[in-house]
Amino acid sequence: MRVTFPDAKALKKIVPIVADLISEGQFVATEEGIKLVAMDPASIAMVIWEMKPEAFIDYTIEGDKEIITVSMDDLKTIVKKLKQREMVVWETDREKNKLKILARGTIKKTFSIPLLEGEETETPIPSLEYNNVVELDSKAIKEIIDDASAIADSLKFKAEPPSKLIIKAEGEMKEMTVELTEGEDAVVSIDIQEEAYASYSIDYLKKFAKAADVSDIAILKLKTDYPLWLEYRYLDKMTLIFILAPRSD
């Protein structure tokens, strides 16, 4: 496999977020692009990172499918060293069992990290159906989650047709409520087809919300006592999706 990113911007934003959830990342490359799908160790959250072929300047893989597994901490360490405007190449070296990461900026640098051995079992993405979809300013939902973390350890979402989303944090003595409706600055679009209620871990939501740097818009999909779907799109070439199991408060 040899793929070339036009710059390091997306990698520097996305890799640390993914590394905060999983220790090993399995990247599956096909003619449709590169995809990472993984559950966190507690099996509470799933992360999906999709990169279309259009995200790359050059895109070459061996055969119909190529799978590589790396330590996300190793990848994060290297990505932190990259400059945003540097062109970046990922190249597999099967003889040395390494992933080479080439940075092409003012200085040409070549890093390498081990390819990990293990079962090449692809994690299936669950088939989920939602009737409630809300598009929010990503920095606004991050602010809501950050503020709520001072109140409680879970965040409650209530969807009310046709266009209201209530987000609430309740502690022993403190409480915070946010009501979002169509027409507000933080709301890009809101489509509530059915009433829904669910509660989710703030610790996980805080990790997800760091993706506000990836995209200006966060897409939420909700259903009663059902996994939360939180999606961020980078220039329509990459997608970062989080699926979070509900809490039974």
Curated annotation (Swiss-Prot):
Pfam families: PCNA_C, PCNA_N
Keywords assigned by UniProt, alphabetized: DNA replication, DNA-binding
Domain of life: Archaea
One record GO biological process: leading strand elongation
GO molecular function, one term: DNA binding
InterPro entries (UniProt xref): DNA_clamp_sf, Pr_cel_nuc_antig, Pr_cel_nuc_antig_C, Pr_cel_nuc_antig_N
Entry keyword annotation includes DNA-binding: yes
Protein's job: Sliding clamp subunit that acts as a moving platform for DNA processing. Responsible for tethering the catalytic subunit of DNA polymerase and other proteins to DNA during high-speed replication.
PANTHER family, per the entry: PROLIFERATING CELL NUCLEAR ANTIGEN
Subunit field text: Homotrimer. The subunits circularize to form a toroid; DNA passes through its center. Replication factor C (RFC) is required to load the toroid on the DNA.
Protein's name in the database: DNA polymerase sliding clamp
Organism, as annotated: Nanoarchaeum equitans (strain Kin4-M)
Phylogenetic lineage: Archaea, Nanobdellota, Candidatus Nanoarchaeia, Nanoarchaeales, Nanoarchaeaceae
